[in-house]
Curated annotation (Swiss-Prot):
Compartment(s): Cytoplasm
Species name: Chlamydia caviae (strain ATCC VR-813 / DSM 19441 / 03DC25 / GPIC)
Reaction(s) catalysed by this chain's protein: CMP + ATP = CDP + ADP; dCMP + ATP = dCDP + ADP
Family: Belongs to the cytidylate kinase family. Type 1 subfamily.
Cited HAMAP family: Cytidyl_kinase_type1
Keyword Secreted annotated: no
UniProt protein name: Cytidylate kinase
GO cellular component, one term: cytoplasm
Transmembrane spans: none
Molecular-function annotations in GO: ATP binding; CMP kinase activity; dCMP kinase activity
Length: 216
């Protein structure tokens, strides 16, 4: 069974998808972390000067695809975690994700991960492009102001003001929805959930009610 959760940044996709996978005992794939791994790698020496095509043809990074364990990212064997959470990496990932060769590379990896069976995928084009035949498709949304407040809590103190982060989110929304290849759209057949005024538990409860009739 494949469940996809798409939506813009700050809607709670990662938190919800991870909690849902835990509740259902499904595998969880944070596809945003995959793009951020590439972006982080490209920001480091000696890979900074490499063309992206060369970097993805011979990637120094890798991902763990192990059933029952969350996807983990490694750079030359070293586990990446907090390094992927900076705004610099997020901005770089947004730019790289517009490249068709990058999206094709990532889509192949994501479909490979799906071979584990019973997966929750979260991202921006999971239900529209990568898994259009997913069993359940969710599109999470929230106001830009609420999303900025949420993202601010995840960033180091004083790294960005709420106003600056709000502007970054609006800019990211435009880039994601207007990009030529696989833009952020509401997938056909997806159920739209506005999480602006809902807690994580409330959103999870709603999704579980939608998923339960489809469980194997």
């Amino acid at each position: 069974m494949i469940i996809t959760i798409d939506g813009p940044s700050g809607t709670g996709k990662s938190t919800i998808a991870k909690a849902l996978a835990t509740e259902l005992n499904f595998n969880y794939c944070n596809t945003g972390a995959m793009y951020r791994t590439l972006a982080y790698t490209h920001l480091q020496e000696p890979w900074q000067a490499l063309p992206i095509k060369e970097l993805i043809d011979n990637p120094p990074f890798s991902f763990s695809f192990i059933s029952g364990q969350p996807l983990e990212a490694f750079l030359e064997g070293q586990l990446l975690s907090a390094e992927l959470g900076t705004q610099e990496v997020a901005n770089a990932a947004s730019k790289l994700s517009q490249l068709p060769e990058v999206r094709s590379f990532m889509h192949k990896l994501q479909r490979k991960y799906a071979e584990l069976g019973n997966c929750v995928f979260e991202g921006r084009d999971m239900g529209s492009k990568v898994f259009p035949d997913a069993d359940v498709k969710i599109f999470l949304t929230a106001s830009a102001e609420v999303r900025a407040s949420r993202r601010l809590k995840d960033l180091p103190e004083n790294s960005l003001s709420k106003e600056a982060l709000h502007a970054e989110l609006v800019k990211r929304d435009e880039a994601d929805s207007q990009r030529l290849h696989d833009p952020l759209i509401i997938p056909e057949g997806a159920i739209i959930l506005d999480s602006s005024d809902l807690t994580i538990s409330q959103v999870l409860e709603k999704i579980l009610a939608l998923v339960s009739p489809n469980l194997p």
